[in-house]
Amino acid sequence: MKQNVLRGKIVEHGMTIGKFCECAGISRSSFDRKMSGSSEFTRDEISRIVTALNLSAEETCNIFFADEVT
């Protein structure tokens, strides 16, 4: 996952992390764990993030999925 790209999209939408978490229905502590790599976003969370940030399919793939298949 590209944490910096996701953070950039949040900023582009004029949101604080707290406001974003509220809009996406994710607790701040859960968001922090996922951003640090301790756990992964679920499909449902990714769907809510896509909606909250109005992400295109390309942007979604760029943020959440690896460039290479291993």
Label for each model-derived stretch:
Residues S27, S38, D67:
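The DNA-recognition helices of helix-turn-helix-type DNA-binding domains
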Residues G14-R33:
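Short alpha-helical DNA-recognition segment
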Residues E12, C23, S38-F41:
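Helix-turn-helix/winged-helix DNA-binding modules
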Residues S38-V50:
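Short, basic-rich loop-to-helix N-cap that marks the start of a DNA-contacting helix
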Residues G8-H13, T51, A57-T70:
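Short, charged recognition helix plus adjacent turn
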Residues R7, G18, S47:
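Residues within the helices of the helix-turn-helix
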